[in-house]
Amino acid sequence: YDMAAVETLGWNVLTNRPKEAAYRAPGAPMAIYAVESVVDELSQILNLDPIDVRLKNAARKGRKSSYGPTFDDVGLIETLEAAKAHPHYQAPLGPNQGRGLSAGFWFNFGGNTCVSLNVNTDGTISVIEGNPDIGGSRASISLMAAEELGVPYEKIRTIIADTASLGHNDITDGSRVTFSVGLATIKAAQDAIQKMCGRAAQIWGIDADAVTWEDGAAVPAGENAGKFPPLSLAEIAAVSFETGGPIAGHFEVNADGAGVSFGVHLCDAEVDPETGATKILRYTVFQDAGRAVHPSYVEGQMQGGAAQGIGWALNEEYIYGKDGRLQNSGFLDYRIPVASDLPRIDTVILEIPNPGHPYG
């Protein structure tokens, strides 16, 4: 939120019981729960619509965040406005039913990445990157490579190599892979395009500066370049051994400029006043995705995050015995939500481009 002054005090507490491992949303939902609970209390005291209170206090472009950086393009206002205009927010509630609202935030991350892109003689493309795919990133990387090269998506194969096969790659974390690996892939594709334009110039007998790349093919550029039919990527690749050997692009980057990401969730729940049994009736997620490279995977991430949050709130708990041993170490006893526990989780993707990335 847009706060004139803020002081944050935190503690690091050493605990020996839970093990340390990779897990989605480290720490963020806990802090957001505290903040959003206070905003809801203020809305009730002031008798104001909770979305209106958030809109009045929402972070905006050019304002400094509580953790240091200055916000660039911020999607919080757009997600709040989308939630307020959605039929879910206006739908009536029945007895023992309530509606919850929360805004959320993640700062995102760039980091160090190396990507190699090989143009194969059959016209296919191999993209080699070093970050495991845990959320559909291979599809997004392939789409960006196809877009930059101007070839069909089916021609791209993204390979997760072991990290000894490339330069340094930071780990898959912090929502960094589509941003940072995507940026390196785009630049590696541009490197390969420059080399393919050079090969086309060699075939035509003209200067490389007189060749440009359009729609997956090299074309002569300018009045003095001569008139030659376009040479497609597949045609250039097929004769690459005769024009200088294999064609590959490479790029390494320490990516900065990762944009912040905001979301708003609406949840309708029904509580049995006698037993306390809780049922989730309706759930809608509004998310600023920057640019949804692969919308189906973006929706899956939104739905998976919502299901995980519901599990935290209603079901999931570590239970320890007096001896400090975990009593529910398996999914038989550690109760995560299953499909029968959840309604359809609706998604609304908003695209507020990040100026720090070629594709937003």
Question: What does each model-identified segment do?
Answer:
Residues 1-106, 122, 144-360:
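C-terminal catalytic domains of large/alpha subunits in multi-subunit enzymes
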Residues 139:
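P-loop NTPase nucleotide-binding module
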Residues 111-113, 135, 263-265:
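Short, small/polar residue-rich loop motifs at catalytic or cofactor-binding pockets
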